C-alpha cells in the first residue's frame, strides 16, 4: 500500500513538474524583448512644426503575445523635447521670446493589435501593420537657459502657481499620458523581427513647456512671492509686455516618439503553442 502511494506521489510530482516546464516554455515562446532607436519632438506653445528640434530617443520594450493578432506590451522610453519662440514665425512669438527643453522618462503599458496574424519565424505570418494603445507615466523637467545656466522652471512657479497670484498649485513633474501609435513588423529569422513605429503621446497637461496659457503674473508680486528668477523667466518679452496672454490654454501639449529596432523572441527556436493561433 505504501509503495502504491509512493508511486502515485512520484507520478503526481512528475506530472506537475512537466506541466510547469511546459507552462514556462509556452510563456517564454510567447514573449519578446527588444529595443528601438529613433527620435522625439513636441508640439505646443513653443513649437507648432512637426519634426522641428527632433532629438535622439530610445525605447526598451517587452511584448507578450496573447494570440496571433493581440499582444500585451510594456515599454520604457527616453527622449528629449525643446522649443524656441525665436524660431517660430509671427511677431507675437518673436516678441514673447520664451524657450525650454526637457528630458522625458516614460513608462507605458497597453495593448497592441495587428492588422494581419503575425508570429516571429512563421512563414505564414511574416509581416503586418499594427495599432498600439497605452497608458503612460512620464517624468518631465522643463528648463530654460538663464545667464548661461540651465534653470529648472517647475519649482519657480513662473505663472504664479502656488501663490495668491494664481488659483492653482504647481504642476507635477510626473504626468499621465495616452500613447497611440502605428507600426509595422517584419519577421527576419526564426527568432528576430524588425519593428518600425510612429506614436503620439496625448498628455493631460499643458506644462510640458512650462507655458500654461494664463496671463502674465505681476512681476513685482511674483518676484516677492517666488523670487526674482521666477519673475525674470516668466516674462522674457522683448517689449516688456505683461498684459497679454502668455500661451494658448485652448490646447494641450503633446509629444511623439518614432523609431526602428529589433524584437527577439524568448524561449528559442520553434513555433508557438497551437492555441496561440
Each predicted region: which residue ranges?
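Residues on the lipid-exposed face of transmembrane beta-strands in outer-membrane beta-barrel proteins
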Residues: 35-39, 60-64, 109-113, 133-135, ...
Amino acid at each position: 500500500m505504501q509503495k502504491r502511494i509512493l508511486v502515485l506521489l512520484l507520478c503526481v510530482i512528475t506530472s506537475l513538474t512537466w506541466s510547469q516546464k511546459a507552462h514556462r516554455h509556452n510563456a517564454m515562446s510567447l514573449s519578446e524583448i527588444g529595443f528601438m532607436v529613433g527620435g522625439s519632438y513636441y508640439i505646443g506653445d513653443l513649437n507648432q512644426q512637426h519634426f522641428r528640434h527632433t532629438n535622439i530617443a530610445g525605447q526598451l520594450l517587452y511584448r507578450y503575445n496573447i494570440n496571433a493578432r493581440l499582444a500585451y506590451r510594456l515599454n520604457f522610453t527616453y527622449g528629449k523635447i525643446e522649443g524656441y519662440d525665436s524660431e517660430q514665425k509671427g511677431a507675437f512669438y518673436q516678441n514673447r521670446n520664451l524657450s525650454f527643453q526637457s528630458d522625458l522618462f516614460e513608462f507605458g503599458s497597453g495593448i497592441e493589435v495587428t492588422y494581419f496574424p503575425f508570429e516571429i519565424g512563421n512563414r505564414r505570418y511574416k509581416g503586418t501593420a499594427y495599432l498600439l494603445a497605452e497608458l503612460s507615466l512620464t517624468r518631465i523637467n522643463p528648463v530654460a537657459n538663464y545667464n548661461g545656466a540651465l534653470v529648472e522652471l517647475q519649482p519657480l512657479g513662473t505663472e504664479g502657481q502656488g501663490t495668491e497670484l494664481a488659483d492653482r498649485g504647481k504642476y507635477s513633474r510626473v504626468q499621465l499620458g495616452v500613447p497611440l501609435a502605428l507600426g509595422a513588423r517584419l519577421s527576419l529569422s526564426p527568432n528576430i523581427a524588425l519593428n518600425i513605429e510612429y506614436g503620439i503621446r496625448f498628455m493631460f497637461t499643458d506644462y510640458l513647456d512650462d507655458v500654461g496659457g494664463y496671463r502674465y503674473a505681476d512681476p513685482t508680486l511674483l518676484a516677492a512671492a517666488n523670487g526674482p528668477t521666477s519673475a525674470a523667466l516668466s516674462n522674457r518679452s522683448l517689449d516688456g509686455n505683461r498684459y497679454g496672454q502668455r500661451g494658448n490654454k485652448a490646447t494641450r501639449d503633446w509629444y511623439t516618439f518614432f523609431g526602428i529596432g529589433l524584437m527577439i523572441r524568448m524561449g528559442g527556436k520553434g513555433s508557438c503553442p497551437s492555441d496561440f493561433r
